[in-house]
Amino acid sequence: MIFHLVPLDDWLRDPDRPYAPASLAEDGFVHCSPDEQTTLAVANAFYRDTVGPLMALLIDEQALDTGVVWEPADPAPPPGVPEATRFPHVYGRINRSAVAGMMEVRRDADGRAVALGPWS
């Protein structure tokens, strides 16, 4: 299982189409994380100012219609993530049938991501 962060509104925008975030057009792949702790570090580094619910998609990489390549962070991983960590990059749109679940990023009073919890 790999994780992908997405604002809830973005995920719900086109429910009948494969998911294609802006990073697919900009970077050529969809950024994902290998585990919950890394996902929280990414949320704190890049999504701290996101307004509204921030979700973590739980993606079954075996069910994807496209390939996943495990690559190092470029230029560096977010704070708290070991330098040697490899990140799963999905080189194509995410078919929604590969999304096995969705969790909400829980934040503290300062907006820091502290846990993943059930979406309510």
What residues fall within each predicted segment?
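Conserved, structured core segments of small domains
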Residues: 1-120
